[in-house]
């Protein structure tokens, strides 16, 4: 940390110190010697001047006045003489006495100059002659009308700025001879047609939109942040806080406004409830859910301190009242839709093992390589019977319905054998399996480190 030195204050001059400390007798010796010229240098000059005399050279301890005769200028420029402006004659001020006329003549009397023009000469003595006429015909001016028709138009404007109150009147129709022009100003109305209004909805369900274009979705309103560090949390147990909170702050007064608005109070010394002491404002209520219950909350402002300027300082308090708890949702045990005796292992496919016996005409035996049963499956054909053995990873017993008997065409028994076309026909396969059938390609996929031979023996499978 850098230490800052104090600013050096200027010391008073010796003259100022001598004026203040001479009378008190506390002046330092150097100040007295400097002011009274008693220093060592002053004494040497005083002693030396007693024995030396330099004449009129002006060398001494006194002021430099140049001796008795003064300094002699060595060589200077001559002074320049400035011409003075001529003096103006004084203005004579004439005094006006009480007997002098108050009218001041602007132009002095002067002689009249004759320009040479002759003066008019009047010879008559009877005055002016008046001439009268006895004609009684009025003077009529002959005005020839111009060619063309005269157009007279009238226009009506409505300005709401100069109408009190501003109203809209029916405009007057403007007429022009020969032409009809109907014009309506912007602020007016034109010829209208009365259309009776009809009621489209009489009884509603309560779900109608309140605007023409309702906003899709829901708008989440931000919840009040009542659980901050700036708010003091106070729990209220009196149920009067819900309906008449003012009775907890001051004396009951029926003039108070509705309890759903912000209530203001004057600071009082004593409150019926000590938790509401120094409360000057109680804001609007709010219902919130917290920790499994419905809570009624209000924010209050206290006026604990008051400054000289009139500003009130106090804490903000969050008053809450727990109305009722929210019951937990009952957990309903899920019941299986199928009976318990139907146990299925793994996924359902066409090779699923069904315990229920069904009347089948034949059974297909499927076994693993370690266990190869030799069950035969008699398939209904008209000419021959084929035995099929399919080794798979697990033993399943799948019922297969063979369908109707189809007589296949056969060739002659004599040699050479000539096959007839078509040799075989497509047969219907009806398998009562589960919800889906797995594509056989997925059974033939090879997996690592598991070598199981998949093969079909004894020809093809037909059903």
Curated annotation (Swiss-Prot):
Question: Known post-translational modifications?
Answer: Highly phosphorylated.
Q: Where does it live in the cell?
A: Virion; Host nucleus; Host early endosome; Host Golgi apparatus
Q: What is the protein's name according to its record?
A: Minor capsid protein L2
SUBUNIT field: Interacts with major capsid protein L1. Interacts with E2; this interaction inhibits E2 transcriptional activity but not the DNA replication function E2. Interacts with host GADD45GIP1. Interacts with host HSPA8; this interaction is required for L2 nuclear translocation. Interacts with host importins KPNB2 and KPNB3. Forms a complex with importin alpha2-beta1 heterodimers via interaction with the importin alpha2 adapter. Interacts with host DYNLT1; this interaction is essential for virus intracellular transport during entry.
Q: Which cysteines are joined by disulfide bonds?
A: 21-27
Which top-rank group of organisms is this from?
Answer: Viruses
Please give the biological process terms from Gene Ontology that the record holds: microtubule-dependent intracellular transport of viral material towards nucleus; symbiont entry into host cell; viral penetration into host nucleus
Query: InterPro entries per the record?
Result: Late_L2
State its role. Answer: Minor protein of the capsid that localizes along the inner surface of the virion, within the central cavities beneath the L1 pentamers. Plays a role in capsid stabilization through interaction with the major capsid protein L1. Once the virion enters the host cell, L2 escorts the genomic DNA into the nucleus by promoting escape from the endosomal compartments and traffic through the host Golgi network.
Q: What is any one of the record's Gene Ontology cellular component terms?
A: host cell
Similarity comment: family membership: Belongs to the papillomaviridae L2 protein family.
């Amino acid at each position: 940390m850098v230490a800052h030195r104090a600013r050096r204050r200027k010391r008073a001059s010796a003259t100022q110190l001598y004026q203040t400390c001479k009378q008190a007798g506390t002046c330092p010796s150097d100040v007295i010697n400097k002011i009274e010229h008693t220093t060592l240098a002053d004494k040497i000059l005083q002693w030396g001047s007693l024995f030396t005399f330099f004449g009129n050279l002006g060398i001494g301890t006194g002021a430099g006045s140049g001796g008795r005769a003064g300094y002699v200028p060595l060589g200077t420029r001559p002074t320049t003489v400035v011409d003075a402006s001529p003096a103006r004659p004084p203005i004579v001020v004439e005094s006006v006495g009480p007997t002098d006329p108050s009218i001041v003549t602007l132009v002095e009397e002067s002689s009249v100059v004759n320009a040479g023009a002759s003066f008019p000469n009047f010879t008559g003595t009877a005055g002016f002659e008046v001439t009268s006429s006895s004609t009684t015909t009025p003077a009529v001016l002959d005005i020839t009308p111009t060619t063309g028709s005269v157009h007279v138009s009238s226009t009506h404007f409505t300005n709401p700025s100069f109408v009190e109150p501003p109203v809209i009147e029916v405009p007057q129709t403007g007429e022009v001879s020969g032409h009809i022009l109907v014009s309506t100003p912007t602020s007016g109305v034109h010829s209208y047609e009365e259309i009776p209004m009809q009621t489209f909805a009489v009884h509603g369900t309560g779900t109608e939109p309140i605007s023409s274009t309702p906003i899709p979705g829901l708008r989440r309103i931000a919840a009040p942040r009542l659980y901050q560090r700036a708010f003091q949390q106070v729990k209220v147990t009196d149920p009067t806080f819900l309906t008449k909170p003012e009775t907890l702050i001051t004396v009951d007064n029926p003039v108070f406004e509705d309890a759903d608005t912000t209530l203001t109070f004057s600071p009082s010394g004593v409150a019926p409830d000590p938790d509401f002491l120094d409360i000057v404002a109680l804001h609007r209520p709010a219902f919130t859910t917290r920790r499994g219950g419905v809570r009624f909350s209000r924010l209050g402002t206290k006026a604990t301190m008051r400054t000289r300027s009139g500003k009130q300082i106090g804490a903000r308090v969050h008053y809450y009242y727990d109305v009722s708890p929210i019951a937990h949702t009952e957990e309903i045990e899920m019941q299986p839709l199928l009976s318990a005796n139907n146990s299925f292992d793994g996924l359902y496919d066409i090779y699923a093992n069904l315990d229920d016996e069904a009347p089948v005409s034949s059974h297909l035996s499927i076994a693993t390589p370690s266990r190869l049963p030799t069950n035969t499956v008699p398939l209904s054909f008209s000419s021959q019977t084929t035995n099929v053995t399919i080794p798979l990873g697990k033993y399943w017993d799948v019922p297969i319905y063979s369908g109707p008997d189809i007589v296949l065409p056969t060739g002659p028994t004599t040699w050479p054998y000539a096959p007839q076309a078509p040799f075989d026909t497509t047969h219907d396969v009806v398998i009562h399996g589960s919800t889906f059938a797995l594509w056989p390609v997925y059974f033939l996929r090879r997996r690592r480190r598991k070598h199981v031979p998949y093969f079909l023996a004894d020809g093809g499978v037909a059903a």
